[in-house]
Amino acid sequence: MIDAIEQNLNRGVQLLKNISEEEYRNTTIAPYYSSIGGHVRHILDVFDCVFEGLNSGNINLINRKRNLRVEQFTEEGIQYFEEIIEKLQQLNSEDFNKIVKVTDDLGLGVLTVDYTLGGILIQAHSHAIHHFASLGYIISQLGISLPDNDFGFNPTTPKQH
């Protein structure tokens, strides 16, 4: 599991190493006018919430850091990716079945439910892939090449021939 998540997050690192600060901050692409940096920050904030709540067993997805420097500067984004990857590498697979409480606001109020650590990591990974797909659209509109052919594709998505 960790290898798959790390491989996916490294796609983000490769993207950031190959774009300009202007491209990273660009918010001109309709319909959402979001930046690559905004998506990167959001993706990594979800993982960060997992690690912030790991010791207590209470993971709160509402309490994201929202570090604006991560949204504005590629080097800050790369550093955040590297911090999350380092924390992932420190996890033990024996802990994936550990029960944790996960709190989030689904739009009709705050809810707390039991997950396994593995379950919330899978959700964070799928969430990252989803946002990479959104980034794929922004990247395309900005005329930037994707880091690789799997960027933003869920492994279960059928490949077109």
Task: Enumerate the predicted regions with their spans.
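A cross-kingdom marker of C-terminal helix-rich interaction/assembly modules
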Residues: 1-2, 16, 51, 135
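Short, contiguous, pocket-lining structural segments
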Residues: 1-8, 31
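Hydrophobic packing residues in well-ordered alpha-helices of helical domains and bundles
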Residues: 5, 9, 36, 40, ...
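Amphipathic, well-ordered alpha-helical segments in soluble domains
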Residues: 8-18, 46, 80, 131-134
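Hydrophobic residues within well-ordered, non-membrane alpha-helices that form the packing/core
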Residues: 16, 85-88, 139
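Short amphipathic alpha-helical segments and their helix-coil junctions
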Residues: 16-22, 107-112
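Short, contiguous alpha-helical
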Residues: 25-63, 110-150, 158
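Short, helix-capping/interhelical loops that line the mouth of catalytic, cofactor-
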Residues: 46-90, 94-110, 144-161
